[in-house]
Structures are given as structure tokens and as C-alpha cells.
From Swiss-Prot:
Family designation: Belongs to the bacterial ribosomal protein bL12 family.
GO BP annotations, alphabetical order: translation
Gene Ontology molecular functions: structural constituent of ribosome
Organism: Salinivibrio costicola
One Pfam assignment: Ribosomal_L12_N
UniProt signal peptide: none
GO cellular component, one term: ribosome
Protein name, as recorded: Large ribosomal subunit protein bL12
Length: 38
């Protein structure tokens, strides 16, 4: 299985737009919103 460090390394290599798309994809997959709590 993949480690948190491997996930962070992969995200670090992505552009801002790719990260935004990743977050949207995760929201769809898990049926959640990644909006930060204030």
C-alpha cells in the first residue's frame, strides 16, 4: 500500500490545477466536501 509520504511527494509534483482537479475527484468519489472548517 502507499504511504502518506508517497502521496505527499506525488501532490508536490503536481500543478495547482492538477491539485484542484484531484480534490474535486476525491469529493466526488467519497461524497464529501473538502472545504476547510473555519
Amino acid at each position: 500500500s502507499i504511504t502518506n509520504e508517497q502521496i505527499l511527494d506525488a501532490i508536490a509534483d503536481m500543478s495547482v490545477m492538477q491539485v484542484v482537479e484531484l480534490i474535486e475527484a476525491m469529493e466526488e468519489k467519497f461524497g464529501v466536501s473538502a472545504a476547510a472548517a473555519v
